[in-house]
């Protein structure tokens, strides 16, 4: 039987407060804010929006508060076409926020206030909902929802798992992540995250993740493109050239392109190309979702 969803995301739901600045100030320095804007965000959330714009069927597992930010997050998902039945709304607490400072070169600094994101428990996850997908895409969350993710991948033995560890999970180390990694169809770290996780460069680090049980590893290398491997295939995939305006959400966009390739049964190299293409569109505009392409642009 065909799954109801192509991808269900599981991660933080945040309102991003984006500050365009002259430069990102270091300790003891000052810098000027050029403009301020708000938009919905969260790593896995950005990825499922990228996928739904490519005409994939997506849903989400997460938590928001019954406040203005929470309602905006749900409304934006529904407007995009992301199913929200797996999202828990609670009366107490605040929805998550991220303050992002982006300079003229497109580089950024992030300050995260997770709030109710970090209170999601396994008991609040709808197992039937989560099991109706081909891929379950995980992004980093705090300890309580992390434990929920570990239990969930154990329960859903027939669902393919993808993981973007982010720096939060990379800092946990391989031992703590192994229960998830061994269930992963693909792990999608950045070069820096892979180094943090394994202590090795991207080629050697990818081999370690494969030994830990990952089916494939796709390493995001920024301006160098990406490296994809399943142990038998090994590909360096060059980037698409574009003018960088804002790197916020670039990795999330890349994940969307790569997962779309997997859904469409493309080979690893083509999946890497799709990841690079979607990321190139994202970084050409301000914000994590503004530049995410439609299917007709592929």
Language-model region placement:
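Nucleotide phosphate-binding site architecture
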Residues: 16, 195, 289
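Conserved phosphate-binding/catalytic region of the ribokinase-like
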Residues: 1-5, 32, 202-298
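Residues at secondary-structure transition points
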Residues: 31-42, 46, 68, 93-94, ...
């Amino acid at each position: 039987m065909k799954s109801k969803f192509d991808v269900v995301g599981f991660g933080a739901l945040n309102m991003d407060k984006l500050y365009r600045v002259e430069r990102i100030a270091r300790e003891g320095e000052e810098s000027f804010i050029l403009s301020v804007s708000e938009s919905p965000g969260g790593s896995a959330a950005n990825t499922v929006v990228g996928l739904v714009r490519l005409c994939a069927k997506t849903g989400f597992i997460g938590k928001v508060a019954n406040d203005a930010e929470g309602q905006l997050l749900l409304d934006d998902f529904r407007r995009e076409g992301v199913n929200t039945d797996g999202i828990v709304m609670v009366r107490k607490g605040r929805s998550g926020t991220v303050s992002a400072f982006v300079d003229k070169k497109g580089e950024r600094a992030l300050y995260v206030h997770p709030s109710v994101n970090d209170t999601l428990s396994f008991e609040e996850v709808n197992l039937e909902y989560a099991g109706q997908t081909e891929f379950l895409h995980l992004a980093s969350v705090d300890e309580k929802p992390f434990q929920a993710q570990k239990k969930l991948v154990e329960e859903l033995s027939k669902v393919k798992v993808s993981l973007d560890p982010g720096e939060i999970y990379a800092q946990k180390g391989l031992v703590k992540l192994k229960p998830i990694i061994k269930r992963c169809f693909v792990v999608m770290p950045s070069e820096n995250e892979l180094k943090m996780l394994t202590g090795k460069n991207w080629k050697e680090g990818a081999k370690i993740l494969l030994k830990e049980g990952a089916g494939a590893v796709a390493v995001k290398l920024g301006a160098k493109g990406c490296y994809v491997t399943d142990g038998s295939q090994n590909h360096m995939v060059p980037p698409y050239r574009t003018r960088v305006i804002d790197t916020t959400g670039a990795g999330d966009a890349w994940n969307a392109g790569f997962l779309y390739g997997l859904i469409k049964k493309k080979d690893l190299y083509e999946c890497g190309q799709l990841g690079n293409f979607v990321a190139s569109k994202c970084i050409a505009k301000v914000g994590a979702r503004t530049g995410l392409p439609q299917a007709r642009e592929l």
